[in-house]
Amino acid sequence: MQSFVAALAERVLGGQSPIVIGLDPRLDALPTSVAPGAEPAARITAFYRDAMPAIARHAPAVKPNIAFFEQYGAAGYAAYEATCAEARRRGLLVVGDVKRGDIGSTAEAYAEGHFRLADAVTLHPYLGLDSAQPFLAHCRGDKGRGVFVLVRTSNPR
């Protein structure tokens, strides 16, 4: 298996846009025609299932923000899982926008869980290298995983 960086570069150099599509589902922004009357998580799942073919034609990767899914509880997490699976089924790389930053066995558990669904994840380094090590272990060799460490964010302050 090639590295995450090599997989992303291959797609971009092969002619796909270098843009990673952020998936931050907001119910008020979804078309009313998407699964009308369904629960929020079902609407989100339906929207991204229907949008994924178009995304896959133009972008090499998606970046679902887990917070927008988690707010709907277990059903929201299931929607996150379904969205990641659909993206991968379509040949897209998945960057889990999870912003994890714990240490020790907690970080190891996060790494195991998130790399089950995503090819790469976002991390924040506040707690130091110990918070990144379990994730970096998944990036060594031919494991095909990657991390994006938050250094400067789009936060206005």
Which residues are covered by each model-predicted region?
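Conserved anion-binding
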Residues: 26-27, 35, 102-157
